[in-house]
Amino acid sequence: MYLPKEKEIIQIKSYKHNGKLHRTWKKTVVLKSTENIIIGGNDHTLVVEADGRKWVTREPSICYFHSDYWFNVISMIREDGIYHYCNLGTPFAVDEQALKYIDYDLDIKVFPDGRFHLLDEGEYEQHRRQMKYPDSIDRILKTNVDVLSHWILDKKGPFSPDYIDIWYEKYKEYR
């Protein structure tokens, strides 16, 4: 498997279950790259939606991807604290073009005070019917919602107190 090197700039591409491109983040700096974990950082990066719409992120973010879990975490560094946006999706795959994953609609938003909410359940159910997600995928996603909830409550991985300090400092050094 191809692995990007630290300091390398990569794209992140999310797809839907039907194979269609969903969204592309144009520039993310690789901060850590192993077979199991890729951590990246970006700030004011161009994002292109599948329909061609474009927008630019507003704040620095640290992105966490794992090869064993069906979620990734985008930690947004804002003036009033750290917000985590967690996408339920496949473990990452990476090649010379981009880091890639399939987005399965469900998201968890974590607020600076630790509160969190599961989002987009209606969109998930609609796409589950339209794209015929297998029951096995549904079970995996529900299990990973539970795993992610425990990580948030236990302040594990990207939710640990030192995580942002360490990786944001490295991002500022690399960019």
UniProtKB/Swiss-Prot annotation:
Mg(2+) 2 binds at residues 105, 107, 120, 123. Gene3D superfamilies: FomD-like. InterPro entries: DUF402, FomD-like_sf, Ntdp-like, SA1684. The keyword Magnesium applies. It is an enzyme of class 3 (hydrolase). Its cofactor is Mg(2+). This is Nucleoside triphosphate/diphosphate phosphatase. Mg(2+) 1 binds at residues 87, 103, 107. It comes from Listeria welshimeri serovar 6b (strain ATCC 35897 / DSM 20650 / CCUG 15529 / CIP 8149 / NCTC 11857 / SLCC 5334 / V8). The keyword Metal-binding applies. Belongs to the Ntdp family. It catalyses: a ribonucleoside 5'-triphosphate + H2O = a ribonucleoside 5'-diphosphate + phosphate + H(+); a ribonucleoside 5'-diphosphate + H2O = a ribonucleoside 5'-phosphate + phosphate + H(+). Its EC number is 3.6.1.15, 3.6.1.6. It comes from the Bacteria. Keywords: Hydrolase, Magnesium, Metal-binding.
